[in-house]
Swiss-Prot record:
Key word Coiled coil present: yes
Composition bias, Polar residues: 468-480
Gene Ontology terms: biological process: actin filament bundle assembly; sensory perception of sound
Any Pfam family the entry gives: Ank
Coiled-coil segments on the chain, per record: 517-541
Gene name of the record: ESPNL
Name of the molecule in the record: Espin-like protein
Assembly description: Interacts with MYO3A (via C-terminus). Interacts with MYO3B (via C-terminus).
InterPro entries: Ankyrin_rpt, Ankyrin_rpt-contain_sf, Espin/Espin-like
Keywords attached to this entry: Actin-binding, ANK repeat, Cell projection, Coiled coil, Hearing, Repeat
Source organism of the structure: Homo sapiens (Human)
Bias (Pro residues) ranges: 334-346
The ANK repeat ranges on this chain: 1-31, 35-64, 69-99, 103-132, 136-166, 170-200, 204-234, 238-267, 270-299
Listed SMART domains: ANK
Length: 1005
């Protein structure tokens, strides 16, 4: 109460009340408002000089007290034009003449900004510098140009005339700012009297004419075009002219005047005309003006959109209807009608193939017309392309998919399919280097050569999927080949990178199926050999004496898998000694994990056989299991170093020589292995210490079960990543690991989502065609397209693969409906806090509500969001925020983590916190203070079924409202995967990459 009374008394200049409060001992420097402004600030703003003197001299309050933004009472006096208070504060109150606040603003900046020429003159007379700059590079002259006060501008140009062409950090000159604010008299003074350069541009390429046209300052535009030599066709960095800016802002008089002055209609860098900009923003009058000046409404930009398309997409249906009506008399109507908007060939090909198998689109797969204007047309008709001369933007590229024979290309800047895609290259090397700490969890420095090994690991993994795709020869058909499956101690099962799950019963069942296939293959070979011998005997002996045939009816068949034509290599039984060999003091893995090596090698062939993709002549390279087990059972330092070199392209010897100066002679890089009995620290260079022996017979190049636990000595175990720094690991190590995990996780899904998938469809089509040509062999087996029907195990494995494939295809179909200009503008000029739904297709002319986002749509939007030019701190905190979202997904459900993400971004958007403040308090409010996530067990493990059932009642279902989900194509061709299924896959995939990161990064010796 006393605090509030003091603030009110200071504002009102009530010295008597302040005296009573002083006698009561209630006045002090701690009395401030919510912004940190004290009593002297409030008295100065109100212009009560006597109150200011009382507070400083009698109450002994500091006259130079600073608010939260660093402003002193002198700043308040300069902003309000209180000359007497400013003079007293500077001369007797302890304030500095050139004191700057947190943003670098001085009293002279504020006096010029608010148009107080008397204060400007006094400050300059007292010796205030006219060239003092803020953190943004603005001088007082720039502030005067914004204020519009000609006297202040003249005083400042007289004090320092060379500042007239000085630009800020964003490239704005005083003339640019005056034109942007519409101050014609200032622009005339700067150009005619001060010689300001009208051709100076901001960093985004905008000139003074562009700024005036964008803000709708008609008189300034006319004066600049008439009395200066500025060009009518001047473009900004994106190729936009003054016509584009005027049409975008709905400034019809400027648009009409520029057209009457002969300004040509030009396209921007992405093929958009001023009519596209006017229609996109719903400016009906501008559209009518442009059409009256003979601008063709049927022109398309590089994404294939007409102006009517953009108007319809953004919900301006009256504008879209008008543009379609005026386009009807155009002779272009003699050509076939346009295709549905937009018409990517990839989507059309996939839709035609799927409709052929299903007999037409079903209710779970709505046509793209639910997201876009409905046109009668042909879905597979290509779009006419206009010739563009401007290059594509550097931040956004588009993908083009080639012929259906399996080849594919990705041409930067080619947007013929309308598919807006992301840059698939990783972060700059400097950003990746910062994710690897310089000290381990014990505070010991990590050798720089070893740090560089880890940096190369992360770089190689972030680009692994692209290199695998480039090396693929056309036989790759699914996402399972992009990363090796691995045994998870957390889930007590085998996880795939997309969250696929294999349990003990699944492996036993697969082993039985593989054995049946091998037996069947041998029987077929014997059948062929017996038939050949019978033919020879019949040729040598008289026909009545010998009649030998082979009845194949009694040959064993693999039930449900007769379509498999590929030869499966025989798997030798694993040696019991090797399978049971365990490092001392280490808990052994389950016995059934000894079968993993041959099952993992055969899994891809088996699943491809289900899809009918394996050709009869395919001969997978075989490798004796005995050798594999022998290699995996002993992992000497030499093998580890060579594995690093082969997998990550890292030369340990070179790195160590580059980053570590030798005080003595270094031991050579011994090509032979270190002795198994050697101590850990005997080999000082050239190789790494020997790791504990693996617990199962896996190939040395594949992840070994149990490596995760042993490799994770970075202070964070594989089962959990603590939300806060523990005693062993500092906060930097914990946050760096979280960043690495989320980058690996999102990079894997992002690359898979934006890799052209037409090859998969083509391979399946060719496989089915070849199967049909086999004649009698194909007649003996059922058709390949149908999923396996015997038992739930093989069917659920097929369903896992199919679900992931259709999820990725669904993402491609959704992104085909996002105009590239929407992504460009969000990336170029973010307004407020960005959110994933802003990067998704509009529904009914508006972005999808955040509250209806499903998990897959959230991820799809986040892929695009992280491609924007974000500040370093915001990017880091968004990575950490994403980590917490996926970390708590399995325990709290999708809607809880979605609300948590929304709460954090809302706090930042409202200005109540900065990204640097973190979000630990909000996380504790949503998820509690427990640092160890209670991972759900797998109730389907014993039955061999993937956990695809509903979440516990405490968790809310993952999917949003059904209409929105259907409009965004969240149903697959298989017809049954839902939000809960996707949550399960994403949750397990996140666990997979957490353990993968722990295996890759080991900061111990």
């Amino acid at each position: 109460m006393e605090k509030q009374r003091a603030l009110v008394a200071a504002k009102d200049g009530d010295v008597a009340t302040l005296e009573r409060l002083l006698e009561a001992g209630a006045l002090g420097p701690g009395i401030t408002d919510a912004l940190g402004a004290g009593l002297v600030h409030h008295a100065t703003r109100a212009g009560h000089l006597d109150c200011v003197k009382f507070l400083v001299q009698r109450a002994q309050l500091p006259g130079n007290q600073r608010a939260h933004n660093g402003a002193t009472p002198a700043h308040d006096a300069a902003a309000t034009g209180s000359l007497a208070e400013l003079c007293w504060l500077v001369r007797e109150g302890g304030c500095g003449l050139q004191d700057q606040d947190a943003s670098g603003v001085s009293p002279l900046h504020l006096a010029a900004r608010f148009g107080h020429p008397v204060l400007v003159e006094w400050l300059l007379h007292e010796g205030h510098s006219a060239t003092l700059e803020t953190r943004e590079g603005a001088r007082p002259l720039h502030h005067a140009a914004v204020s519009g006060d000609l006297t202040c501008l003249k005083l400042l140009t007289a004090a320092h005339g060379s500042s007239v062409n000085r630009r800020t950090r964003s490239g704005a000159s005083p003339l640019y700012l005056a034109c942007q604010e519409g101050h014609l008299h200032l622009a005339q003074f700067l150009v005619k009297d001060c010689g300001a350069d009208v051709h100076l541009r901001a960093l985004d390429g905008m000139s003074a004419l562009h700024a005036a046209a964008a803000r709708g300052h008609y008189s300034l535009v006319v004066w600049l075009v008439t009395f200066t030599d500025i060009g009518l066709t001047a473009r900004d960095n994106e190729g936009a002219t003054a016509l584009h800016f005027a049409a975008r802002g709905g400034h019809t008089p400027i648009l009409d005047r520029l057209l009457l002055m002969g300004t040509p209609i030009l396209r921007d860098s992405w093929g958009g005309t001023p009519l596209h900009d006017a229609a996109e923003n719903g400016q009906m009058e501008c559209c009518q003006t442009l059409v009256s000046h003979h601008v063709d409404p049927s022109l398309r930009d590089e994404d294939g959109y007409t102006a009517a398309d953009l108007a319809e997409y953004h919900g301006h249906r009256d504008c879209a209807q008008y543009l379609r009506e005026v386009a009807q008399p155009v002779p272009l109507l003699m050509t076939p009608p346009p295709p549905p908007f937009p018409p990517p060939p990839l989507l059309a090909t996939r839709r035609s193939l799927e409709d052929g198998r299903r007999g037409g689109p079903g209710p779970g797969n709505p046509s793209p017309m639910s997201l876009s204007p409905a046109w009668p047309g042909h879905p597979d008709q290509p779009l006419p392309r206009e010739q563009m001369t401007s290059p594509a933007p550097p931040r956004i590229i588009t993908s083009a998919t080639a012929d259906p024979e399996g080849t594919e290309t990705a041409l930067a800047g080619d947007t013929s399919d309308g598919l807006a895609a992301l840059q698939l290259d990783g972060l700059p090397s400097g950003d990746i280097d910062g994710l690897v700490p310089t000290r381990d969890e014990r505070g010991q420095p990590i050798p720089e050569w070893k740090r560089q090994v880890m940096v190369r690991k992360l770089q190689a993994r972030l680009g692994a999927e692209s290199s695998a795709e480039a090396q693929d020869n056309g036989g790759s058909s699914g996402p399972t080949e992009q990363a090796a499956w691995r045994y998870s101690q957390t889930h007590q099962a085998i996880l795939g990178p997309f969250g696929e799950l294999l349990t003990e019963d699944d492996l036993v069942y697969l082993e039985k199926q593989i054995a049946d296939l091998q037996l069947r293959r041998r029987c077929q070979e014997y059948e062929s050999e017996l038939g050949r011998l019978a033919a020879e005997l019949q040729a040598l002996l008289p026909e009545p004496l010998v009649s030998i045939t082979v009845n194949s009816h009694f040959l064993p068949r693999a039930p449900g898998l007769e379509v498999e034509e590929a030869s499966i290599p025989a798997a030798e039984p694993a040696g019991s000694a090797e399978a049971s060999e365990v490092a001392p003091g280490v808990q052994p893995l389950p016995f059934w994990c000894s079968h993993i090596s041959r099952l993992v090698r055969s899994l891809s062939l088996l699943l491809k056989g289900v899809h009918g993709l394996v050709q009869g002549d395919e001969k997978p390279s075989t490798r004796p299991l005995q050798d594999t087990c022998r290699e995996a059972s002993a992992s000497p330092p030499r093998s580890e170093a060579q594995r690093q070199i082969q997998e990550w392209g890292v030369s340990v010897r070179t790195l160590r020589g580059n980053f570590e100066s030798a005080s003595g002679p270094l031991c050579g890089f011994n090509p032979g292995p270190c002795e198994p009995g050697a101590q850990h620290r005997q080999c000082l260079s050239g190789c790494w210490p020997a790791l504990p022996k693996p617990r199962s017979g896996l190939a040395s190049g594949e992840p070994r079960p149990g490596d995760t636990e042993e490799a994770s000595d970075s202070g964070i175990s594989c089962e959990e990543v603590p939300s806060e720094a523990g005693a062993a690991a500092g906060p930097d190590l914990a946050s760096l690991r979280k960043e690495r995990i989320i980058m690996l996780f999102l990079s894997h899904w992002r690359r898979s989502a934006y890799t052209p998938a037409l090859k998969t469809v083509a391979c399946r089509t060719l496989g089915a065609r070849h199967a049909g040509l086999r004649g009698q062999e194909a007649a003996r087996s059922p058709g390949p397209p149908s999923p396996p029907s015997e038992g739930p195990r093989l069917g659920h494995l097929w369903q896992q693969r199919s679900t992931i494939t259709h999820l990725l295809g669904n993402w491609k179909a959704i992104m085909a409906h996002v105009p590239a200009r929407q992504l460009r503008r969000l990336s170029r000029q973010p307004r407020g806090a960005l959110s994933p739904e802003q990067f998704l297709p509009h529904v009914d002319g508006a972005p999808v509500p955040y509250s209806s986002l499903s998990l897959d749509l959230f991820m799809l939007g986040y892929f695009q969001l992280l491609e924007c030019d974000l500040p370093a701190e915001e990017r880091k905190l968004r990575h950490l925020l994403c980590f917490e979202v996926f970390e708590h997904l399995g325990t709290h459900g999708w809607e809880a983590v979605r609300a948590f993400h929304k709460a954090v971004t809302d706090e930042v958007a409202a200005g109540r916190r900065a990204w640097t403040d973190g979000f630990e308090d909000i996380k504790a409010r949503f998820f509690g203070s427990s640092q160890r996530p209670a991972w759900d067990t797998e109730p389907g493990r014993k039955s061999g079924l993937t956990l695809l059932g509903p979440l516990p009642h405490a968790a809310v279902p993952c999917s949003g409202p059904e209409p929105t989900a259907q409009r965004l194509g969240s149903r697959s061709q298989q017809g049954s995967f839902n939000g809960e299924d996707i949550c399960g896959y994403i949750n397990r995939s996140f666990a997979f990459w957490k353990e993968k990161e722990a295996e890759m990064f080991n900061f111990g010796e």
